[in-house]
Amino acid sequence: MQVLRRVITCAALLALAGCDPARVARLEEGVSTETQVRQQFGEPVTVTVLPDGAKVLDYPRQPEGWTNYRITIGPDGKMSSLRQLLHADNFARVHPGLATEQVRELLGRPAKMQPWPLKNETEWQWRFRPDVNRSQLFSVFFGPDSRVLRTAVSDDPAEQAQAGR
């Protein structure tokens, strides 16, 4: 029974991962409307209205997925950008001293937030794929002032468990 449950879970995750590229391909910057974006991606987890009337829609795929999408709808109601936030360039922008809000702006909602009381730190983790065959974790450690202390990249333990490592 547990094997069947694992197979069904894996199939569902693969199906979800396979849907996003098709959704992205159906949308075009400067052409697609907010309604079309919501038809493809559903309701966003967060909506931020900017001073000029533009909207920023966040679609995190964490904790089970490997992407976080941020879609901007311009004041004209058309999609002006669609970005996947979890990539090396954004990870490189995270440096000591950044505040939690700045990190969330760069990477979107984390997969996991883990307090480490004895160290007086909090760790945020994001799952990502550096290539199609690997899953890794990008971790950001915050001090008691909610500022970045350091970052780290490690292998995804969930992937290792599935592989029987």
Task: For every predicted segment, state its role.
Residues 19-165:
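Residues within mature, well-folded domains
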Residues 1-17:
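Sec-dependent bacterial lipoprotein signal peptides
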